[in-house]
C-alpha cells in the first residue's frame, strides 16, 4: 500500500476548500503555519499551498508521530521544519503560529478535544485553527447495494483500528467545547459523487484490502472487487461518506 499516493488522493478532494480557507485565514500574511499530522507531506509540500511562490516568507512547520512518514515528508517538503511528536502534546510554545491546521487527523488521535485544545494553545490570539476534513462513516452509503456489506466491514475495521468513525458530524461541537470561535463549518463533499478513474478506483481498493486484511477471505474480496469493477464500468459505482470541515479563530 502506497500511503503517500493515498494522501495525495485525499489532498485532491480538498484542494479547492484548502485554497479558500487559507485565503480567508490570511495565509499570505502569516509568518508561521503548522500542520498537525503532516504525514508524508501531501498537504505541506509547496505544490499544494496557495500561491506558495508568492509567499516564501511563510515558515512551514509539520509534526507527526510516524518516523517513516516524516522521512517521506522531508523528500516532498524539504524546506519545512519537521518534528516527530504527538498531537495531544504539541512541543511548541504558546501563541507560536498564525495558522494551525489538520487534515483527516482528528478521527485517529484518541482524544480529539485535547488535540484541538493543543492546536488552540499554540496558535496566536486572533490566529486561525482549521480542521480541513473529518469524515462521518456512520452516514456512509455504498452503491450498488450489494457493496454495503463491504462498507460496513470496513467501518468496523476502522473502529477496531481506533478510529472515531462519526467524528465529522461532531466537529463543530468539538470546536465549541475547545473554546475556538467557529467562523464556518459544513460538509465539503460526498465522496464518490464524481466518477472515479480506474487508477483512483484501484487506490480505493488498496485501502479496502489494507483495512480488511485478516477479516475477509481472499475469495470474498475477489468476488466483491469483481462486482464493484462491473459497477464502475456501468457508471453505477458510488461511495458517499459525508466529510466535514471547520474553521475557527482563537
Specify the residue positions occupied by each region the protein language model found.
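Conserved catalytic/acceptor-binding region of the Class I
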Residues: 130-196, 210-211
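A short acidic, Gly/Pro-enriched loop at the edge of an enzyme's catalytic core
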Residues: 88-99
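Class I SAM-dependent methyltransferase Rossmann-like catalytic core
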Residues: 1-15
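Class I SAM-dependent methyltransferase SAM/SAH-binding core
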Residues: 32-34, 40-89
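A short glycine-rich, Lys/Arg-flanked "PGG" loop and its adjoining helix->strand segment in the class I
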Residues: 113-128
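A short SAM/SAH-binding and catalytic strip from SAM-dependent methyltransferases
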Residues: 99-112
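Conserved alpha-helix/loop element of class I SAM-dependent methyltransferases that forms part
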Residues: 12-29, 46-50
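C-terminal helical/coil "lid" or tail adjacent to the Rossmann-like core of SAM-dependent
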Residues: 2-4, 183-239
Amino acid at each position: 500500500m502506497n500511503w503517500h499516493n493515498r494522501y495525495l488522493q485525499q489532498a485532491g478532494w480538498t484542494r479547492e476548500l484548502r485554497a479558500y480557507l487559507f485565503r480567508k485565514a490570511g495565509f499570505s500574511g502569516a509568518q508561521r503555519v503548522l500542520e498537525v499530522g503532516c504525514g508524508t507531506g501531501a498537504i505541506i509540500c509547496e505544490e499544494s499551498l496557495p500561491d506558495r511562490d508568492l509567499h516564501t516568507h511563510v515558515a512551514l512547520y509539520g509534526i507527526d508521530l510516524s518516523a517513516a512518514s516524516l522521512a517521506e515528508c522531508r523528500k516532498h517538503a524539504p524546506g519545512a521544519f519537521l518534528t516527530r511528536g504527538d498531537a495531544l502534546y504539541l512541543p511548541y510554545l504558546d501563541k507560536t503560529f498564525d495558522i494551525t491546521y489538520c487534515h483527516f487527523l482528528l478521527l485517529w488521535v484518541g482524544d480529539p478535544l485535547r488535540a484541538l485544545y493543543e492546536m488552540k494553545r499554540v496558535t496566536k490570539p486572533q490566529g486561525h485553527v482549521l480542521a480541513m476534513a473529518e469524515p462521518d462513516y456512520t452516514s456512509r452509503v455504498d452503491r450498488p447495494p450489494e457493496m454495503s456489506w463491504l462498507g460496513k466491514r470496513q467501518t468496523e475495521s476502522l473502529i477496531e483500528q481506533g478510529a472515531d468513525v462519526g467524528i465529522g458530524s461532531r466537529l463543530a461541537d468539538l470546536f465549541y467545547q475547545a473554546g475556538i470561535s467557529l467562523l464556518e463549518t459544513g460538509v465539503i463533499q460526498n465522496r464518490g459523487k464524481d466518477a472515479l478513474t480506474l487508477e483512483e478506483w484501484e487506490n480505493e481498493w488498496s485501502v479496502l484490502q489494507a483495512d480488511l486484511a485478516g477479516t475477509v477471505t481472499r475469495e470474498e474480496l475477489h468476488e466483491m472487487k469483481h462486482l464493484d469493477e462491473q459497477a464502475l464500468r456501468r457508471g453505477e459505482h458510488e461511495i458517499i461518506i459525508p466529510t466535514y470541515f471547520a474553521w475557527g479563530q482563537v
